[in-house]
Amino acid sequence: MAGNFSEIESQGNISLKFGFLGLGMGGCAIAAECANKETQIKNNKYPYRAILVNTNSQDFNKIEIKNAGNVRKIQLEGYEQGAARNPQVGEEAFVKHETKIFETVKQEFEDRDFIWITCGLGGGTGTGALLKAIEMLYEHDYNFGLLLTLPRDAEALKVLENATSRIRSIAMNQEAFGSIVLIDNAKLYRKFEEENPSALANEYTSYSNKYIADALHEINLVTSSFTPFSDTHFDASEFAQVINTPGVLSLAKLELKSNQLDTENPLGYLTQLGNALEKGVLYDTEREELESAKKSALSIVTSPLRASRLYNFSFLNQMENFLKDRTPYVDERPIAPYVNKHTAKKEEDIVKFYSVVAGLPLPKRVSDIIDEITRIKEEREQANSKKSNAVLNKLFAFDDSVQEEKPKKKKLNFGAEPEVEVADDSQPTKKKLSF
């Protein structure tokens, strides 16, 4: 099933050494989960490194770290209470500690092939620090890209506005750095709900962070872990070129049983592959968006038994035509059939397709968030106006001109004593109140 990432074979080798610079609560959690990925590579059990940068000191306590030697935490002193979803505070905190952050980057990421800045868009610390982190890595000539989560529509208006504001700034400068991987939280949330209907709400964060880490880790293994079946190959250097391509990067995966791959009648599985390409693993794309891609690649992995039957001229020709049809204007689009010699018995009949498409425009999901912001503002204005008018109408209709009758003054009566008449001018005039 497309996007259903399971743990890849433990014997795999990574293609590129990634470093993860986590910003804010969301970005730190993703970066830490990526650094938690394990392999059985000798002397490299934990192949990735992470630097976690945050204001709120309590957030660090929520993050699980399997190997402390691969993770560095930077507490932005003076901002321990957090940024309260105010990006200006997050930016100020990063700038104040930028020297310390950069020194840590030099130490921890010296041997890294590529750095991912991870951030949950919409908050204060990560969203605020993001542009300054981009400037820092850009000024010092690092190869880097962005791993950003998009908020769900259910988030508060301020969160949606913070996210779109940063996306606009990034889009204006996206040619200056590598790929942007967007994670649609709405998509992952729906997937989590479908797969775990009885799960607790707080389990989603752990699920999504692991899902993101698995997706990136698996594609980094595919390009370096299996035996090429033909001369066509998608190796680590080509993968590096893809993720260094400016624009948005889409990852996709599809698993099929070999009996679903009828090369005499390819329409069925090519349709499924096309749907997987558009659905993606982390966010949805549209066919028109794919057509504007700059680079694409398709890797196919199966067991030795199935490879000898499946990887014929007809099948590979169908794959080439399929990718050409979906990404017609790319600079490169290799088709790479692989053999997994360590396939488990239960997966001998499975064929896995992995695609990477780079240089894409911003997806429709960003436009949907902007539409949601507009809708909320319009409905809020209408609601406030309606309520305000109702109150004013009542207030102006209220008649407070009540005439009060002045009580007659009672005459005193002392019994048999002669009645004394009180003169009217002996009583002071009562001062009227004025409102």
Swiss-Prot record:
One of its GO terms (biological process) is plasmid partitioning. Its EC number is 3.6.5.-. It holds the Pfam family Tubulin. It is found in: Cytoplasm. Belongs to the FtsZ family. TubZ subfamily. Gene3D superfamilies: Tubulin/FtsZ, GTPase domain. It catalyses: GTP + H2O = GDP + phosphate + H(+). Forms filaments. Binds to the TubR-tubC protein DNA complex. A tubulin-like, filament forming GTPase; the motor component of the type III plasmid partition system which ensures correct segregation of the pBCXO1 plasmid. It is essential for plasmid replication. Binds GTP and forms filaments. The filaments seed from a DNA centromere-like site (tubC)-TubR complex which extends to surround the TubZ filaments. Highly dynamic filaments grow at the plus end and depolymerize at the minus end, a process called treadmilling. TubR-tubC complexes track the depolymerizing minus end of the filament, probably pulling plasmid within the cell. One of its GO terms (cellular component) is cytoplasm. It comes from the Bacteria. Consists of two domains: a nucleotide-binding N-terminus that hydrolyzes GTP and a C-terminus domain necessary for polymerization. The domains are bridged by a long, central helix. Interactions between the C-terminus and the following monomer drive polymerization. This is Tubulin-like protein TubZ. It comes from Bacillus cereus. The keyword Nucleotide-binding applies. The gene is tubZ. Residues 403-435 are annotated as: Disordered. Signal peptide: none annotated. GO terms for molecular function: GTP binding; GTPase activity. GTP binds at residues 25-26, 124-126, 185, 209. Keywords: Cytoplasm, GTP-binding, Hydrolase, Nucleotide-binding, Plasmid, Plasmid partition.
